Amino acid sequence: MGLFNFRKTVDQDIEVQSSIKDRTPGFEYLKENEIYFDSACQSLRPQPVINSLINYYQKHNSCGERVKYQWGKITDQKVEATRDHLLKFLKLKKKDYFVSFTLNTTYGINLLLSQFDPKKAGIKTIITSDIEHNSVFLSTMQLSNRTKIERIVLSRDQDGSLPLSEVPDNSLVVVNVMSNVDGRILQNLRDLVEYVHQKQGIIILDAAQTMAHHSYLLEQTEADAICFSGHKVYAPSLGVMIVHRGLVEYLNPTFLGGGMVDDVDKNTYLPSFEHQDKIHTLFEPGLQSWGEIIALDESLTWLEQLPQSTKDNLKGCSEKLFEFLSSHPKIHCLNHHASTVFTFYIDHIDSHLLAEALSDQGIMVRSGYFCVHYYLDHKLKLPPLIRVSLGYQNTESEIDRLIKILKKF
């Protein structure tokens, strides 16, 4: 069926099956016919997280790490609690790691690589992979151009593993733990981290797609840095950098500003980040998004308290959608297994027009190349695609509705 006929007839024979009562508590604000399938871009925020952000603005709106009045003290206490919670969430030791906040994953990775000095670290090769988001692909490209160090793009295995034998000694490895295209997971993550360190290398992980539903993969994973976004983990818009203290010796500060210094003379300054208890300020020039940081703490608590039934529901939704997409004769699905992230295209159907048609039915999906241009457009030479990414707000009836619509093609 063409899109024109589809848009004319779909309302006549598809009932809205979604039921508010089936939704995970916290998303009651969604209307019955609003189906959000774009969690890989940014997750919806459950009401307790929204309330936490509002509480900051209404109860103790203040500048952190700068003031002596009571509101500021409350902010400082809650921000530090978020830093501690993040390390406990991933079972990492405070003596080894620190937490800094920034804009998003892309900014965090770029901030690290723009400050990184390969000569200090003895790095001779930059390694990334073919299925990386542009945040990794472009920043490693820029680092290579700046330092004239060879950059190698490795192909990931079908299960997401990176071939260890192709990683040279003294390499800087920057890769994702989960793909934002097909949900492929870096299956040999722990072996890779251990191998890179044995070969006198450094490894930085893009965990943007990992933290919300697969954070267990990162627990006690002793990478040199882990970057992710709060807005993909049911928290407000925020970037998070979890950095090994030992990595700092290979960094040259590039951004400077308030909150990073103890004193400033005419031509010199005394950096705060040289103190271990203030080392996080290395990546935090100026005022931070204090309310968003505090609300991130609430999102971690919300995730920790999710009942198993909610997790099972998401797993069931993923498996049901994968079974359909992988078996439909006209749908080309890139996934090799069920995931919370699915990418596909349909024969003779423009994906951008399909996304608009689905939007007419209250179904929100992404279309295009999802910031993975090299892999999708140039390596696989695919047309623009549709991405459906699931979250804890989704229900089985929403999957049924999507399937019923796609069956029309």
How would you name each of these model-derived features?
Residues M1-F409:
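Pyridoxal 5′-phosphate
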